[in-house]
Amino acid sequence: MAERKPVESWLTDMDGVLIHEGVPIPGADAFLKKLRDSGRPFLVLTNNSIYTPRDLHARLSRMGLDVPVENIWTSALATAQFLADQRPGGSAYVIGEAGLTTALHDVGYILTDHDPDFVILGETRTYSFEALTKAVRLINGGARFIATNPDNVGPSAEGDLPATGSVAALITAATGKKPYFVGKPNPLMMRAGLNAIGAHSESSAMIGDRMDTDVLAGLEAGMRTFLVLTGVTQPKDVDRYPFRPSEVVDSIADLVDLV
């Protein structure tokens, strides 16, 4: 078996790896500082489409974590780039927040509820029956169904929240149409992120806390994968999957010396 190349570029998930319930995970600051000091290409990825990179930069800064705006890659950005490639200057009906609508505006998309090319479902905390009904009718009328990410639940201080995947399932039940999910574990999001920083999969690593999104996305993109145990996955969970990460570590602190 060919020896793996040293890791030259890093992609890391945010929730469960760098932060947990709004608090930095020990080692996150040291890891990010070493990345910045080394000059190695890196991205912080998130399937959450609510916030813009500028919003996330500000939130992380308030926690004491310095991540430049250009080093943040969201499922909203990946979705906008995908749609700009698929249908430049197209139109969309959007259920989502500023992170998604801003990304679509930035690639020249028209947001409308009149005969759109696409219905795009993203993360929001204010899903309305009216908006979901409109989405169902537009999809039944021929609009193509896109969703930013397949996560069924998202974290909060009070416990799990229903997320994009759960709401997409509702729309699928009403229309018979399944969405195309752009975010992790779709390797499309990973490859677009790698391209954005000029990195190559064979010399890059993905760090995550979820087997079903982070590790799977890294594997399918041909990257080395590190599973941390500071998020949703526990050691006993790993054997439930037919694939394994390259390494399992306790936390991001264990990876500082690899940068």
Label every PLM stretch briefly:
Residues 2-40, 49-73, 77-259:
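Asp-based, Mg2+/Mn2+-dependent phosphohydrolase catalytic module
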